[in-house]
Amino acid sequence: MELLSSSPAQLLRPNLSSRALLPPRTSIASSHPPPPRFLVMNSQSQHRPSISCASPPPGDNGFPAITTASPIESARIGEVKRETKETNVSVKINLDGHGVSDSSTGIPFLDHMLDQLASHGLFDVHVRATGDTHIDDHHTNEDVALAIGTALLKALGERKGINRFGDFTAPLDEALIHVSLDLSGRPYLGYNLEIPTQRVGTYDTQLVEHFFQSLVNTSGMTLHIRQLAGKNSHHIIEATFKAFARALRQATESDPRRGGTIPSSKGVLSRS
């Protein structure tokens, strides 16, 4: 068999005879630019929704303006001054506070309970009261509660965007207290505490029910207080104030799904 030999130059030389067999290329003029190498998805595609990363317009200080949509108006503060021949009471409550308590009623145990209201409700509570405590604590206890209820009423305003309802069960050692409330504008108190002693320190334990009845009357809330367990008078009363504070906090906080509307099918929550 005879081997064919070719030089390197011959191997690299193009085969003119095979190129001649190809048809000549035809150039087609087009006014459109060539298509892009990569497919660009339409921003309206249902498979890949477009996401805007544009910054908000600058504010007065040159930084992007930040806006927050809150269904609850700012500065929900209620302030009341109540003066009679028996007592002189001033109350200021900030529903959107930080749990700051500053109370001086002349009744040490009541001051301690108002501390629970502020701390567990995260309300800022300022109370000043003087009264005829040389007789007993009844008038001061009552008028402080009346003023707190009125301050709550003022702070809530039209009650737009709030949860309206609150429910909490608080334990304190052997005591267990359940509180459920509705900022309905209809005053009612359901109360079944069984406090075993007549006094805690110098405080008459009968005044606990009278405190909440007075608060309900002026605030216009529906309030139910139930004792599920408990033997120690101090524990029962303190757990009651803690549960009340937590339930009131729930009821006054914002419901973002409500969008600032009044939480009632009637469209109004009125004290009257």
Swiss-Prot record:
It catalyses: D-erythro-1-(imidazol-4-yl)glycerol 3-phosphate = 3-(imidazol-4-yl)-2-oxopropyl phosphate + H2O. GO terms for biological process: L-histidine biosynthetic process. InterPro entries: IGPD_sf, ImidazoleglycerolP_deHydtase, ImidazoleglycerP_deHydtase_CS, Ribosomal_Su5_D2-typ_SF. Mn(2+) 1 binds at H112, H139, H234, E238. Residues 24-65, 252-272 are annotated as: Disordered. Its EC number is 4.2.1.19. Belongs to the imidazoleglycerol-phosphate dehydratase family. This is Imidazoleglycerol-phosphate dehydratase 2, chloroplastic. It comes from Arabidopsis thaliana (Mouse-ear cress).
